[in-house]
From Swiss-Prot:
Belongs to the selenophosphate synthase 1 family. Class I subfamily. The active site is at residue 19. Keywords: ATP-binding, Kinase, Magnesium, Metal-binding, Nucleotide-binding, Selenium, Selenocysteine, Transferase. It comes from the Archaea. It is an enzyme of class 2 (transferase). The keyword Repeat does not apply. Mg(2+) binds at residues 53, 92, 246. Binds 1 Mg(2+) ion per monomer. This is Selenide, water dikinase. GO terms for molecular function: ATP binding; magnesium ion binding; selenide, water dikinase activity. PANTHER family: INACTIVE SELENIDE, WATER DIKINASE-LIKE PROTEIN-RELATED, SELENIDE, WATER DIKINASE.
């Protein structure tokens, strides 16, 4: 986008990009500790409060899921940025096991010098993604802000028996991931200035593949993976998933750790499926991808699945053109943490 003769790069207007702008999990825990207490959440209609992907409230025989997600640009194209933001915002509803999103309140932060037509392109991308996923913007809020921001407050509905949380993980479960890792590193590659490109041993063809693969991942809705899970469950006539989350700013190990902590189990991650070349690039950029903490934007679902049904689940995911990586397993009860296996394998996609 251009302002007069000046080329506008959204990513140059911020210091942190996408889900990397989020508060670290330990600081987030400290922030809310003692402010929202257990007593505040005693209402029997609050089925899920803090610490999950969305809150779940029971009303008139249905459950309402509520979540909010807002972040900074990770790409320069405002339309694509809008689609990524909508994908990320809606994902937390799907990560609770619910398919029906009844509306989205768009939230936009606008720097004073950012042309309004750029903001309109972001909103257009956001709304187009919503339409593609059977929902719509129903309202929202805008503010003037030093950094551009876009996201939404999302409401989903469903039945109580459909809800999946981070707390249901069982010993013996396998963990299935529905998107590769490495979006943080891939998009950092896209921001390398022209004068420094020669310092990185990578062809233009490889660079384009890495960046386009990341954008494809960040604009692919987790709705498709959840629908595949439901189809697999219909096929076997039983529940397959014991727990569910999505992989975003805390990385695969950070989000696995939340599942392990909430379920009081030990999870071992033994596979890191990554976008091509991002493992070596992550070392160069100082990202924690190979430690399991690479910040993902609009990452995949992480499904804690019953081992006896994993082949059925993988088959339905692949039929839906989703990735299906078996990335770990639940080793034992107790400990309440996730760890990388000593012989963790890294594969490139």
């Amino acid at each position: 986008m251009e302002r007069g003769n000046e080329k506008i790069k959204l990513t140059e207007l911020v210091k942190l990009h996408g889900u990397a702008c989020k508060l670290p999990s330990t600081e987030l825990e400290f922030l809310v500790k003692g402010i929202v207490t257990d007593d505040d959440l005693l209402d029997k209609n609050i089925l899920v409060g803090l610490g999950d992907d969305a809150s779940i409230i029971k009303r008139n025989g249905l459950v309402i899921a509520k979540t909010v997600d807002v972040f900074t640009p990770i790409v320069d194209d405002p339309y694509i940025q809008g689609k990524i933001a909508a994908c990320n915002s809606t994902s937390d509803i799907y990560a609770m096991g619910l398919l029906d999103i009844v509306g989205v309140l768009a939230i936009v932060g606008i720097p004073e010098k950012l042309p309004i037509h750029v903001v309109r392109e972001m909103l257009k991308g956001f709304q187009d993604f919503c339409r593609e996923n059977k929902t719509t913007i129903v309202g929202g809020h805008t503010i003037l802000n030093p950094w551009p921001l876009i996201g939404g407050a999302v409401t989903g509905v469903g039945r109580e028996e459909e809800v999946l949380t981070k707390a249901g993980v069982k010993v013996g479960d396998v963990l299935i991931l529905t998107k590769p890792l490495g979006t943080q590193t891939a998009m950092a590659l896209s921001r390398i200035p022209e004068e420094f490109k020669d310092l990185i041993s990578i062809t233009e063809e490889e660079r384009d593949y890495i960046i386009n693969k990341a954008i494809e991942i960040m604009t692919t809705s987790n709705r498709y993976a959840l629908k595949a899970l439901r189809k697999a469950e219909e096929r076997v006539g039983d529940k397959i998933a014991n727990a569910l989350t999505d992989i975003t700013g805390f990385g695969i190990l950070g989000h696995s750790n939340e599942m392990a902590k909430n379920s009081n189990v030990l999870i071992e991650i033994n596979l890191l499926p990554c976008i091509k070349r991002t493992p070596e690039l992550s070392r160069l950029f100082g990202h924690a991808l190979l430690d399991g903490y690479g910040a993902e934007t609009a990452g995949g679902l992480l499904i804690s699945a019953k081992e006896e049904y994993k082949d059925n689940l993988i088959d339905e995911l692949e039929k839906a053109k989703c990735y299906a990586f078996e990335v770990g397993r639940v080793v034992k009860k107790g400990e309440g943490k996730a760890v990388l296996s000593k012989d963790v394998k890294v594969i490139e996609i």
